[in-house]
């Protein structure tokens, strides 16, 4: 990711007059390959890797017509909050939709999230994958959606400031589960920035429409 390793600099003396064929064997490769003549090699330009986000170009979650699993509101403040459903719901894909925040801003944040099984205890998060997140802040830090189950209460998922409500995140639990509720941990800082206020939960056996 730095200097000749990202530009694959080839000294001109290696080339013959006229037409040359240059073959590059690369596992990753750039988005577009190009060749350019330079007077000096690029040796000190760092290309920083941007964190991978969980929303592909053109994707937009469609919840119209989906069965609502639960809706409610959290209470303001730091620390874990537990939500129990009136009736357990079976499914593999867990969608949490944030509708508002306590600080009045458009940002939503989650430090950690647990999904509760039929026995009321957190199910294993080993097989979890983030299928979709409508917004993830990566310019001012690495606040991607996978932070909600990294076992680190100091890290968190955060949406971008300019993104407006509602915000959604979809988790693939790895297999079908009987879900009795969930637990939510806001950010640990004073005032719990981005703490979700009103929310909805959708649970499906098959993935959501994106």
Provide a role label for each language-model segment.
Residues 52, 60-63, 76-127, 135-138, ...:
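Aromatic, loop-rich ligand-recognition surfaces of beta-strand-rich domains
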Residues 1-8, 64-78:
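Solvent-exposed beta-strand/loop surfaces of large extracellular or lumenal domains
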């Amino acid at each position: 990711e730095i200097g000749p390793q990202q530009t694959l600099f080839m000294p001109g003396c290696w080339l013959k007059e006229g037409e040359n064929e240059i073959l590059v064997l690369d596992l990753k490769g750039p988005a577009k390959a190009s060749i350019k003549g330079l007077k000096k090699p690029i040796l000190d330009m760092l290309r920083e890797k941007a964190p991978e986000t969980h929303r592909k170009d053109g994707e937009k979650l469609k919840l119209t017509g989906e069965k609502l699993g639960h809706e409610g509101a959290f209470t303001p403040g730091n620390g874990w909050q537990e939500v129990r459903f009136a009736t357990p719901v079976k499914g593999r894909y867990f969608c949490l939709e944030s509708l508002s925040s306590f600080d009045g801003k458009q940002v939503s944040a989650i430090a950690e999230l647990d999904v509760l099984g039929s026995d009321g205890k957190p199910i294993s998060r080993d097989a979890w994958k983030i299928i979709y997140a409508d917004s993830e802040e990566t310019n001012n830090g690495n606040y991607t959606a996978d932070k909600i189950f990294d076992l680190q209460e100091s890290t968190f998922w955060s949406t971008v400031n300019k993104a407006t409500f509602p915000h959604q995140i979809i988790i693939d639990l790895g297999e079908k589960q009987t879900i009795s509720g969930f637990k939510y941990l806001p950010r640990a800082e004073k005032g719990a920035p981005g703490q979700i206020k009103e929310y909805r939960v959708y649970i499906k056996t098959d993935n959501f429409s994106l």
